[in-house]
Amino acid sequence: MTRALYVAVLAFSALALGAPSASAQGAIAGTVTDDQGPLPGASVLILGTSRGAATLADGTYRVADLRAGDYTVRVSYVGYGTTEYTGITVRDGATTTLDAELAPQSLGGDEGITVVGDAPLIDVEQAASAYTISQDEIAARPVRDVEDVIANQAGVVRDPTGLYIRGGRATETGYVVDGVSAKDPLAGTGFGLDVGSNALREVEVVTTGADALAGDATSGVVQVKTREGSDTFEAALAYQTDNLGGLADGGSSFMEDNVEFNVGGPILRDKLRFFVSGQGTFSDEFTRFVSTPDQVRSSLYDAEWLAPRLSNRWAGLGKLTFVPRQGTKLVGSFQRSLAINQNTRMLQVTGNDAVVRPGYQYAFALQPDAANTYTQDANLSYLKLTQVLNDRSFVDVQLSRLFTRLRSDANGRDWRPDNVDSELDPESLVDFPVTIFGDPREGIPADTALFVLPGPGLFNNGGIATRWHDHFAEEVTLRGEYTRYTPDESYTLTAGFDARLNDYQWIDIVRPWVGAPIVLPDGTTTQSNRLGQSSDIWRVKPRRTAFFATNQFRYRGLIANVGARLETWAAGAYVDDLVEQEAFTIPEALRQGYLDDTTPFLGLRWKARLLPKLNVSFPVRENQVLFFSYGHSMRLPHPTYVYANLDPFYQDRSFFSDLGNPNLNPEIDIAYELGLRNQLTKDDALNVTAFWRDKFDFITVASVTVADPTGRETNRALRVNGDFARVRGIELSYLKRVSDWLRGQVSASYSRASGLSSTNNDALQDLLQNGNVDNTFETPLAWDRPLDVKASTTFLYDRPAPFLGVPGLNRFRLFVETTYRSGQRYTPVEFIDNERNPFTGERDWRPIYETVDDPALRFSESGRAWWWFDLRAERRFGIAGTDLVASLEVSNLFDQNNAVIVNPVTGRGYPDVDPATTDFVALRGDADYDVPSNLRDPRYEDPQTSGLPPFNPARYLAPRHVVLGLKYSF
């Protein structure tokens, strides 16, 4: 596919859908008033057209020459709130009367546009792909957090490894909560602060290039707005469980419980309001049928009640809103989340073949109490002032602090023991009773050497997880934003800045017991300055600033947003001092390059980049808008690639260890988008979008020679800007509404994401194996999912009379959604031969499959497609003016198997069998059970068997999950 093809598709769609038809013209006319009388000079716009008018001295207006159809009319006036009237029908040769009354604008409540009538299905003026999920829509879906909320939007792919927007990496997503970046900059997950679904007011996901107001995102931006209190007291308490009574013994129970509450209302009516919410979700996950630790422990917190299950999430929010006078609003908020679990995807910085693997630690299935436990604690606090300056301008000033910390330990153990008195490396050993390996055809002669079968392939020797990790990130941000618009709103200027002070600390140690004291027989202890097998320790204080401006022009239906964002950043005094001191850890060429490419200012050395932004929308015909967007975005490299092992004191002396590159440049994304929005009727909408993204200056690995403290030359892995990727695709979506009781949508996308490598470490493997990098082939990326189709429908019947006359079938809501998606990418294998039979010497033993040598075939195949259905049903009961809601949620309704870990021999997941009851010898010769050489094949057990068994329960998505719930609100 090429960009020209996408343009041709959109042009054809515009011609086909926009062909004019001969008909009479209609008009809309009326009067605009306030509580005092007519409003002269008010603006009346017919959205999705180039038509509009200004009211005359008596407040009247008339908009003529409108084609028959349904329209949305926006009425606005300086100093008054904007109101949109939807579903205004115009008929041939007739004039539709629409009178409007505006109220003075106040920032005391939620800013926004008042909608009279059914909300528009789409925003025909929007010049970029963005989807907004309202609080009511969130309540209708089976969701727990922000990722759940946006997972079913077009262009968004979520799986157990992360969330990907339009082919970008999971780490490229921007995550903003109430105007503050809320992702952990060191964890590499794309998210950080966890916000409970009951605290969400609105979630918007922007899948195209973000506008100038957002930064540090090269894939998409998730914008979260949390709830505020109102002048009406309200409270709610909810409980959901999948283990009620006999449900706990079924396969659809993950031993999950979810408790949440929220309360809000006035403290001083019309002046001071509050809102408080909390959520706790605890689950043993579907892997509980294989293994569950007796107790998940964290070395950060001793309280075991914080982690009653395998996966534990806590989230809380408190917010105060103060409106001392009209035009002034002050909001203060504190949010905190805590997660304790054993999911390795909590820390996604390094890794090569694990890029698309789920986080379940299958190797520790026999001793889960020795696996890695991850604890992430995040809190966000801010104070935001909104001040109206006059009837045409206002400012926002926000001071915020985000603090995130993540600890990974061996299920709560100290970073290393005071005394090494046992084997700590986890291994799979032969267990008792042993199994003798012999010829099954005849008895074993007495003088024959006996062999036993090896261990199970899973760790069983009491060894513990080999990585100990701790990091924290503090980010203090001051942000200011100024907005000014003309009286007729034909021009709007938004300009501002944000300044960030960061403080990062990173400690990562592999096999930390290496170098720990060992008590000798004479009572003395060994002495060592070794800090684990390998380690990386640093603390840095980088700085960032940004200046941004967006100019919006409106002219006869055309809306153009032209803007730019200037990003500046400094690596911090830590790097500047090492460069100035000519530290031996920084090669001379790298040091000189850093000095040449940075500019000294305010005691630090800075870099800068200008990012232009443009998006335009204009009506092709009534209710049909063509839009185009173009923008540059950037994301700074992960700090480990900048600072690793630069400190001469904390030097990792392991073979080919990482070396930070302080002169790394940011990764760049250039996004293009062309789309067509069609409001076919007030209840039907169709969108067609083509997009293209060029990504370059991605991080890869090169070999560099540096001198160690003794002067000996050593090879190090240096991160450099040398990789690229690109994404291209087409999206279609159709939305349908039937009165107030049915709403549905269908979206489909076809895209391709390709590049030189899928992780920052792909080139490292070539360097270690071959001494050079053979990475010149552009191949599909590991997370590429070409086809993604989603459909959902919401049926709402909130009437006293029963539906179809069935008693009790009233005041209910039903939500059903389905997803069909291309399967997981994998690199094919080829059949080499069969192993020799240990009894006969013939080559009729285990089939040998090896990964193909051709690098052009990397991730060239896709596994079997994924398909599943989710359902949520609820019934409301009125109790003395309050509401009690009973709910049923079923995920993966039809219990379909969708392979996350693909067997490259078959292109499917390893068959879902019970290893304890299956006769694997009888399955010899069955190609469905063939596996590559790096996995254990249970059909051919012999003394040389090695590798993990193929029974990892996380090889499939979660099976059917049934959750019951009750919610009481008043």
Regions found by a protein language model. Name each.
Residues A212-A214, G229-E234, L268-L272, G327, ...:
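Short loop/turn motifs that connect adjacent beta-strands in outer-membrane beta-barrel proteins
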Residues G81-T82, G87-E101, G109-A212, D216-V221, ...:
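Periplasmic N-terminal accessory/gating domains of Gram-negative outer-membrane beta-barrel systems
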Residues G112, D396, S400, P619, ...:
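Membrane-embedded beta-barrel scaffold of Gram-negative outer-membrane proteins
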Residues S253-R345, T373-V395, R565, P612:
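Transmembrane beta-barrel wall of Gram-negative outer-membrane proteins
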